[in-house]
């Protein structure tokens, strides 16, 4: 139906002028709004600031492994360049170089994450100072915290260079740099290799023996760096790798429901944790004997049972369930309800559930009081929250007071921005299926190219992040030259050095590793 409009009223001249003015104002406003994204886009194209090169140099003296050592500490930055010679990053290192007439080895140190600064190895075992935290898996409390001399530092045997990859510590993107340049498995390996080579060139240390020491993802990085260090352009050989809490092949350290391998590699860690928390009677079996038994069961009985799956008969199913209940400290009923599959995260939540507690991920000796006792996984990592504030405060105090660093920006201990933005594949071709991260073949290849390179593999029994049995599994199946690998174990977790007896043992093992031929 069509409605007839009424006769329009007469419009006077004043109304027309006001109307035109309003239209003009709207057009101007719309034009400004349309141009704003162009302005924003143009601002995004601007280069990031490029910090000036600075060095903070201090002189010190300390006693390490009963030897008096005079050394220079240098906190300095360097500019990382892309293939065009443009600055993409500003990398900061902390170096300790002893006064010596001899050509000493130099060890390059980094932690993992990805997105973690080198604070843990720096202030936990290798540097000249230690952050003092309780050895018995108790919370470190609130400040002030104690910084103590580290008599176990290997400074008597090797110079040390602590590397904070871009986005961690004081290191940052700069100039033309963006996340895609450095925050990926291959990109990170290349950029950290560039840091190593730059430091060696700037300090005239090309002919020194060289070691890499990495922890957790830092071990992934160390292996991934091999093709970038020992390349055709400027080949550099590494004398040895110190892999602390290794994570080379992620198949065995990814506790997913459909990953049968991880149920096997994690089981000894679950058993060690059950033993530590008295869910397995300690007087009836030692930790070492328990580990021997559980590893044999995991490989000889548990893995075949997982592969058989629903074809297991009732007798076989019940046998495996009873053995798992013993090794994990959980009830037979719960094991059966889980279809013989209890992930590490579920075990961390369930083991001490009768006490309203969950065990820690980085170190399962720790436990936390859970708000929600019915949740499937722990709310947070008891080990991490127990020590992180102490390490952060201790390092910042040390940098600004002892090493005289005057930068006012934050020292980024752990970057969620780096971690969440990480690109894990290594240039995966289109049409190819994704797979677990694995840098073990890089290590195996380099050990063949460099027949004198040696490896130290250090693992903690109570580590739910990188289970120690996965280290054995990884090194046994990738063609790695085991005759040049030293495997050591500690009654602690991921950062085993926060446990005083393990600190002493790992320090001695590192000392012996550097001295060995």
Walk through the language-model features, giving the residues of each.
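N-terminal cap/lid subdomain of alpha/beta-hydrolase-fold enzymes
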Residues: 36-43, 85-181, 476
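N-terminal cap/lid segment of alpha/beta-hydrolase-fold proteins
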Residues: 52-95
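Alpha/beta-hydrolase active-site loop
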Residues: 155, 182-200
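Alpha/beta-hydrolase fold nucleophile elbow
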Residues: 205-216
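Glycine-rich nucleophile elbow surrounding the catalytic serine of serine-hydrolase chemistry
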Residues: 214-227
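A catalytic-pocket lid/entrance helix-loop region that shapes and gates access to the active site
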Residues: 230-312, 318-323
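C-terminal subdomain of alpha/beta-hydrolase-fold enzymes, centered on the catalytic histidine
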Residues: 244-245, 249-262, 330-515
């Amino acid at each position: 139906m069509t409605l007839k409009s009424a006769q329009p009223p007469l419009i006077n001249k004043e109304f027309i002028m006001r109307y035109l003015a309003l239209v003009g104002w709207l057009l101007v406003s719309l034009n400004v709004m349309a141009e704003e994204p162009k302005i924003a886009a143009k601002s995004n194209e601007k280069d990031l600031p490029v910090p000036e090169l600075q060095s903070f140099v201090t002189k010190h003296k300390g006693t390490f492994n009963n030897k008096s050592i005079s050394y220079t500490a240098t906190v300095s930055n360097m500019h990382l360049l892309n293939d065009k010679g443009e600055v993409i990053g500003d990398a900061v290192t902390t170096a300790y170089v002893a006064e010596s007439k001899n050509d000493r080895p130099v060890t390059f140190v980094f932690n993992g994450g990805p997105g973690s600064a080198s604070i843990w190895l720096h202030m936990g075992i290798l540097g000249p100072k230690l952050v003092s935290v309780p050895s018995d898996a108790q919370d470190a409390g609130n400040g002030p915290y104690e910084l103590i001399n580290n008599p176990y530092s290997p400074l008597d045997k090797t110079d040390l260079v602590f590397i904070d990859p871009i986005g961690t510590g004081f290191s940052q993107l700069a100039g033309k740099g963006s996340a895609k340049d450095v925050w990926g498995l291959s990109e990170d390996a290349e950029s950290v290799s560039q840091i190593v080579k730059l430091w060696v060139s700037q300090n005239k240390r090309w002919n020194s023996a060289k070691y890499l020491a990495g922890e957790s993802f830092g071990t992934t990085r160390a292996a991934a760096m091999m093709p970038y260090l020992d390349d055709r352009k400027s080949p550099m050989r590494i004398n040895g790798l110190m892999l602390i809490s290794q994570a080379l092949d992620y198949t065995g350290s990814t506790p997913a429901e459909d990953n049968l391998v991880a149920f096997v590699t994690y089981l000894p860690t679950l058993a060690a944790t059950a033993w530590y928390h008295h869910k397995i009677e300690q007087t009836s079996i030692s930790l070492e004997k328990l580990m021997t038994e559980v590893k044999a069961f995991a490989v000889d009985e548990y893995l075949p049972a997982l592969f058989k799956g629903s074809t297991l008969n009732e007798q076989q199913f019940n046998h495996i369930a009873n053995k798992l209940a013993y090794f994990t400290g959980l009830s037979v009923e719960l094991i059966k309800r889980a279809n013989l599959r209890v992930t590490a995260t579920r075990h961390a939540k369930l083991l001490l559930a009768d006490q309203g507690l969950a065990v820690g991920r980085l170190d399962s000796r720790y436990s936390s009081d859970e708000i929600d006792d019915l949740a499937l996984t722990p709310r947070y990592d008891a080990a991490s929250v127990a020590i992180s504030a102490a390490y952060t405060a201790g390092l910042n105090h040390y940098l600004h007071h002892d090493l005289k660093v005057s930068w006012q920006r934050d020292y980024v201990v752990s970057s969620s921005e780096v971690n969440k933005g990480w690109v894990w594949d290594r240039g995966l071709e289109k049409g190819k299926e994704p797979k677990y991260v694995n840098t073990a073949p890089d290590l195996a290849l380099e050990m063949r190219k460099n027949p004198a390179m040696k490896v130290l593999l250090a693992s903690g029994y109570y580590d739910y992040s990188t289970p120690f049995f996965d280290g054995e599994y990884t090194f046994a199946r990738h063609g790695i030259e085991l005759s040049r690998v030293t495997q050591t174990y500690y009654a602690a977790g991921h950062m085993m050095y926060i446990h005083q007896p393990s600190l002493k043992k790992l320090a001695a093992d590192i000392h012996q590793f550097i001295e060995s031929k």
